[in-house]
């Protein structure tokens, strides 16, 4: 009996690991264009600002597509659906690698965004299903770890490949790695019938849960604030702090590395007091932004701020996702789809707000505005916490 139990634990952990790898590859491809923007612009003889529109387009496609695409796929067996998503993901990366003009590249990115929309709508609930019985919370932490590793390893490796070969090779390699992950998924995952996915009828039911709606608004507010600053952190460090490109790269690496610590802290502390955990994580996101300009020339302080900020945003993202699942156990996929859409509204809005701040006030002010949006989100958290204290 002990061998059977050990075998179960081993396979369950391997399945969680496959989902973590999947999170890694999806998050890598979402943000790797940032590291390749100049090279892509040069190859198409375009301005970087114009090419950057594909990042905005990606976020908005995910925002608009998450819920309707999840509903369309609600009754499909989950393993089959995942393999289809990876097929679309891989084919779109092949098209990215072969793109003969910017519009073809944009179309390929939209294909990837469609896969992303459904993947993140169903993955959180699935990783909890396949995890060992006593490791559900840790499984969600491992999923977030995969996302963090995309920032630590995925983006730097993507840039290195792009510099050594070309940007097309980066997309080709991502497609190749995704193929290996899909094979692992096909081999390791059991049949996963759709369960508690929810239907279109679930949407009005969820909308009648005020705390859940409050959490979605909180996600939009705090992520908008985060990406108001984070979208332009690289030019801030180079132009305002006047640190070298190598130091800038190291700081971005530290930000990603901090995500690992954030995942660990979530696994250890969230269950003890979820409300305080979310509030503390938000403070870790807000304070470094507000103080970014104040300590702009103190290298070690900026490193510390970046590290704490990275811990905060990773911890907060997982905690809010877990809270959504707890508030909607009867429609986990619909709830996750709305969460993913809300998160990407925050990404797109934050990048837009940051651009407006830079043009109207200057690059040095992004942290103040991003932090101010975060403070509004913190006040909103306080309000819904008091109003729905027993929920």
Swiss-Prot record:
Listed A to Z, the keywords are:
Cell inner membrane, Cell membrane, Membrane, Sugar transport, Transmembrane, Transmembrane helix, Transport
- Molecular function terms in GO for this entry? carbohydrate transmembrane transporter activity
Organism classification, top ranks?
Bacteria, Pseudomonadati, Campylobacterota, Epsilonproteobacteria, Campylobacterales
Question: What is the role of the protein in this entry?
Answer: Involved in the efflux of sugars. The physiological role may be the reduction of the intracellular concentration of toxic sugars or sugar metabolites.
PANTHER family to which the protein is assigned, alphabetical: PURINE EFFLUX PUMP PBUE, SUGAR EFFLUX TRANSPORTER
Q: Give the principal location in a single coarse category.
A: membrane
* Subcellular compartments: Cell inner membrane
What membrane topology does this protein have?
Multi-pass membrane protein
Q: Which family does it belong to?
A: Belongs to the major facilitator superfamily. SotB (TC 2.A.1.2) family.
The protein's name is Probable sugar efflux transporter
Q: Which cysteines share a disulfide bond?
A: none
NCBIfam families, sorted: PRK03545.1 (NF002921)
Where does the sequence pass through the membrane?
16-36, 51-71, 82-102, 103-123, 138-158, 171-191, 210-230, 247-267, 277-297, 300-320, 338-358, 361-381
Record InterPro entries: MFS, MFS_dom, MFS_Efflux_Transporters, MFS_trans_sf, Sugar_effux_transptr_put
Q: Which GO terms describe its cellular component?
A: plasma membrane
Q: Answer whether the UniProt record assigns the keyword Transmembrane helix to this protein.
A: yes
């Amino acid at each position: 009996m002990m061998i059977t139990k050990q075998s179960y634990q081993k396979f369950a952990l391997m399945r969680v690991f496959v989902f973590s790898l999947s999170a890694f590859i999806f998050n890598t491809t979402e943000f790797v264009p940032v590291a390749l923007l100049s090279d892509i612009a040069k190859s198409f003889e375009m301005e970087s600002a114009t090419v950057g529109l594909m990042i905005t387009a990606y976020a908005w496609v995910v925002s608009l597509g998450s819920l309707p695409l999840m509903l369309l796929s609600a009754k499909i067996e989950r393993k089959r659906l995942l393999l289809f998503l990876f097929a679309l993901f891989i084919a779109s990366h092949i098209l990215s690698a072969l793109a003969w003009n910017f519009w073809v590249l944009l179309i390929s990115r939209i294909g990837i965004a469609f896969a992303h929309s459904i993947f993140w709508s169903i993955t959180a609930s699935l990783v909890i299903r396949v995890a060992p019985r006593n490791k559900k919370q840790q499984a969600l932490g491992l999923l977030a770890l995969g996302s963090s590793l995309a920032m630590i390893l995925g983006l730097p490796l993507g840039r290195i490949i792009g510099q050594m070969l070309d940007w097309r090779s980066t997309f080709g390699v991502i497609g190749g790695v995704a193929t290996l992950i899909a094979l692992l998924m096909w081999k390791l995952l059991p049949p996963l019938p759709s369960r508690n996915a929810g239907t279109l009828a679930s949407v009005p039911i969820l909308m009648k849960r005020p705390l859940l709606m409050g959490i979605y608004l909180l996600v939009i507010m705090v992520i908008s604030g985060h990406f108001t600053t984070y979208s332009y952190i690289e030019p801030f460090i180079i132009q305002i702090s006047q640190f070298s490109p190598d130091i800038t790269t190291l700081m971005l690496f530290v930000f990603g590395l901090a995500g690992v610590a954030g995942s660990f802290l979530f696994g250890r502390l969230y269950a003890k007091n979820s409300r305080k955990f979310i509030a503390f994580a938000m403070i870790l996101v807000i304070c470094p932004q507000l103080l970014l300009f104040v300590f702009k020339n103190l290298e070690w302080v900026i490193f510390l701020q970046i590290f704490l900020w990275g811990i905060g945003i990773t911890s907060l993202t997982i905690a809010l996702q877990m809270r959504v699942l707890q508030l909607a156990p009867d429609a986990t996929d619909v709830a996750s789809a709305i969460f993913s859409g809300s998160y990407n509204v925050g990404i797109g809005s934050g990048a837009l707000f940051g651009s407006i701040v830079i043009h109207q006030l200057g690059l040095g002010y992004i942290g103040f505005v991003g932090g101010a949006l975060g403070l509004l989100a913190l006040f909103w958290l306080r309000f819904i916490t008091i109003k729905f204290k027993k929920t």
